[in-house]
């Protein structure tokens, strides 16, 4: 019988291999001894984070990243089916998540969306290169409690501030929390623009969202 550490490694490696079959096989094995949230967080998401690092270093290319993301989604779907009915139906909150206009990076934000969803939040992922007004319009449409704004470049960081300003103009700021993230974002930046929180990675995003919304 494989140890938990070995199973976690196998899950992570299966994501990096970009092979859906390998991911599903690893998930089936891990399910026997691990909770779904742990499989996603410590295994699949860790692998996806590694894929992101390899992509940034030019060791993997976009098609690999897309295949790895598809494989992860397939693994998460299997686990969602196994989660207790209550976990699937009881929504902790409604979150709109996207990457700001001018920024085509998607990996980190997608991992955050997947992790938030698996933690029990209703997540509306509006993609990448999203115009400022779309964040606010979507939040209104789905009656969101929180907006997650990712920016991966210093040039697009300003978009996070603009979303907050627009929320204020629309009179929504008091009821919609704002979480910012992405490589150039910091806690100091979040404080400066008046965001409710900053999350360095997907696990932290889940913890902060629970802190703010529960």
Curated annotation (Swiss-Prot):
Record-stated family: Belongs to the methylamine corrinoid protein family.
GO MF terms, alphabetically ordered: cobalamin binding; cobalt ion binding; methionine synthase activity
Signal sequence annotation: none
NCBIfam families cross-referenced by the UniProt entry: dimeth_corrin_MtbC, pyl_corrinoid
Amino acids binding methylcob(III)alamin: 105
Species of origin: Methanosarcina mazei (strain ATCC BAA-159 / DSM 3647 / Goe1 / Go1 / JCM 11833 / OCM 88)
SMART domains: B12-binding_2 (SM01018)
Function: Acts as a methyl group carrier between MtbB and MtbA.
Every B12-binding domain range: 92-214
Protein name: Dimethylamine corrinoid protein 2
Pathway annotation: One-carbon metabolism; methanogenesis from dimethylamine
Matches recorded under PANTHER family: METHIONINE SYNTHASE
Keywords noted in UniProt: Cobalt, Metal-binding, Methanogenesis, Repeat
Domain (B12-binding N-terminal): residue spans on this chain: 1-91
Gene name as annotated: mtbC2
Cellular-component GO terms for this entry: cytosol
Gene3D superfamilies in the record: Cobalamin-binding domain, Methionine synthase domain
